[in-house]
Amino acid sequence: MIARHRDLVGLYICGGGMEGVIAAAREEARARLAIVCNELTAKSRAGLIDGVLTAVIHTPTALMAERALEAMNQAIEAGSKATATQIVVPFDLFLPTNI
């Protein structure tokens, strides 16, 4: 896709296949292509360091689980008076400059 679409300036990888996109971007070595993906892994960290990736949006899963458990405990304690709860967990944004 990267090779076929020369007018492509940005790519967001929101699901699987990040490793393949990183490998393809390394082969193409296009300076103008901004690539953003989800979750900081060894491969995405290397992509940031190498300059292949522009940014990584990372979900703090431990914090998300902690907040979900807190909400469940509150719902159990509230019993029939429990109401819907919205939990906001901030994301981490990693760039080549802060990795």
Roles of regions detected by a PLM:
Residues M1, A29, L53-A55, Q74-A75:
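Short, hinge-like loop/turn segments at secondary-structure boundaries
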Residues M1-A42:
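Hydrophobic alpha-helical
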Residues N38-A42, T59-M64:
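Short, acidic/turn-prone active-site loops that include or flank metal/cofactor-
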Residues A46-G47:
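Well-formed, non-transmembrane alpha-helical positions, independent of function
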Residues D50-A62:
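Short beta-strand elements at the ligand-binding edges of bilobed clamshell
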Residues L63-I99:
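Hinge/cleft segment of the Venus flytrap/periplasmic-binding protein
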